């Protein structure tokens, strides 16, 4: 498999993970952290760090909005238990 195809597949799998987490609002970050060792906030941090490595400025709130699919404050208000 060539590198471009591999990156396309990885990107598609990541998009599916994000969509899955956006649908599963019942799954709390603390549960993800306890079971898997990462949560939505970790994903947003990793996303921002990878952007910064490429000299792309993304704020923490913007990175979180990308991962959560809405502003983090809105998600917390609606779904955090």
Provide a role label for each language-model segment.
Residues 1-81:
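Domain-level signature for proteins that mediate thiol-based redox and metal-cofactor handling
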């Amino acid at each position: 498999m060539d590198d471009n195809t591999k990156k396309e597949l990885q990107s598609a799998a990541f998009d599916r993970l994000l969509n899955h987490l956006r649908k599963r609002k019942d799954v709390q970050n603390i549960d993800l952290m306890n079971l898997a060792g990462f949560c939505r906030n970790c994903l947003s941090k990793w996303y921002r760090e990878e952007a910064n490595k490429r000299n792309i400025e993304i704020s923490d709130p913007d990175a979180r909005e990308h991962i959560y699919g809405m502003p983090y404050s809105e998600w917390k208000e609606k779904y955090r238990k």
